[in-house]
Regions:
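Asp-box/BNR beta-propeller blade signature and adjacent active/binding-site loops
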Residues: 1-368
């Protein structure tokens, strides 16, 4: 059972006639105090050099939000950067922020380089807070064996064994090459983010790129990952794929086609053999889809589905236009799910409405 309860806005530019400020790429976490934090990127355009991570906080389970401010001051760095990080609350109460930043030596170039089909170079970074996200250590660069930047666009997870795991595809180098291949990399830390390895592959299949990878743990050592599968050779977006591990991420299954023609997606464990997933569908019948999944015998079997945002959800924009009228020009993505307790969950995503980048959350009730 999936029930839509209500929607709220985390960030919307209060003065769009004065400043160009857009919100993108949210990530939610629930602190041990019960307070929620939302990381998101704010900048004047989608690939603007001044895009950087901000933090908002909620004391009422996501109904209202207060902007805390910038995650850190990246103007101190020797090279201009823009960054995107996501929070994870550890069992001991510490908060880990993990993500990546692009090096923007030429502010007139975008992140993607059309001439080569490559991307700006970058660094994978991690930071820690021991006061519920009010103060953070200076982001530390994570050494990696791959020359390509790892797309750690989702949060890391803390497994029941105490390890931290994160997933990512590889961005091509600025010259358009990818010497490591079209693979998915698992990053592992045994010491709460102090050191990391990136020598395990969670995905290596038919030269398909596993963008926007997300991971969750079910029973101890049983992991499931979902990806936005992209075939660069044919420029085709394939249905979301999932792969699983039963040994703590050391080895992984071949990917399974879910049949859901989504792009950025995410998933969480509800207990037993049940997962909940959320998908950005941007082609046929666009919108945000939430599904309950029976993952018995490590096979993907949808048992319930609900569109929580999009034309068929009956959503109306602020100007009264239906989503069916707005979706021709609407952009949205990077959805995620957060368990609030009991049968309540919060879904987050970004959207561009009336030319403005917003961060939205939706309260749901779900039962297996």
């Amino acid at each position: 059972m999936i029930e839509y309860v209500e929607g709220h806005v985390v960030y919307d530019n209060p003065k769009p006639h004065i400043h160009s400020r857009h919100g993108y790429f949210p990530g939610l976490a629930r602190l041990n105090s019960g307070e929620l934090i939302c990381f998101f990127v704010m900048g004047e355009a989608f690939e603007a050099p001044n895009c950087t991570t901000y933090i908002s906080r909620s004391k009422d389970n996501g109904r209202t939000w207060t902007l805390q401010g910038r995650f850190y001051d990246n103007s101190r760095l020797p090279v201009p950067t823009n960054d995107s990080l996501k929070p994870t609350v550890l069992r001991d109460g510490k908060v880990i922020a993990m993500g990546f930043r692009y090096l923007r030596r030429d502010p007139e170039q975008g992140i993607a380089i059309p001439e080569t089909n490559g991307f700006q170079p970058g660094e994978n970074v991690v930071s820690v807070s021991d006061d519920d996200g009010h103060h953070w250590t200076e982001p530390k660069v994570i050494p990696r064996k791959h020359p390509e930047l790892i797309e750690t666009s989702g949060p890391c997870i803390e497994t029941q064994s105490g390890e931290l795991l994160a997933l990512g595809a590889l961005f091509k180098l600025p010259d358009g090459t990818n010497p490591s291949g079209e693979i998915g990399v698992l990053m592992r830390s045994p010491d709460q983010g102090k050191t990391w390895t990136d020598d395990t592959l969670f995905y290596n299949w038919r030269k398909i790129t596993p963008y926007e990878a997300r991971i969750c743990e079910m029973q101890p050592g049983r992991l499931v990952a979902i990806v936005w599968a992209y075939d660069a050779a044919t420029d085709r977006h394939l249905p979301n794929q999932v792969t699983f591990s039963t040994d703590g991420g050391k080895t992984w299954s071949e990917p399974e086609d879910t049949g859901h023609l989504g792009q950025a997606s995410s998933l969480i464990w509800l207990g037993g053999e049940t997962l909940a997933s959320i998908h950005s569908h941007r082609s046929t019948a666009p919108g945000l889809y939430v599904r309950l999944i029976d993952f018995s015998k490590n096979r993907w079997k949808p048992v319930d589905e609900k569109v929580i945002w999009g034309p068929s959800a009956g959503y109306k924009g602020s100007d009264g236009a239906t989503m069916a009228e707005m979706f021709a020009a609407l952009k949205f993505g990077q959805p995620s799910l957060l368990h609030l307790g009991g049968d309540e969950f919060l879904a987050a995503h970004w959207s561009i409405e009336n030319g403005q980048g917003k961060i939205r959350v939706h309260r749901l009730r779900m039962k297996a």
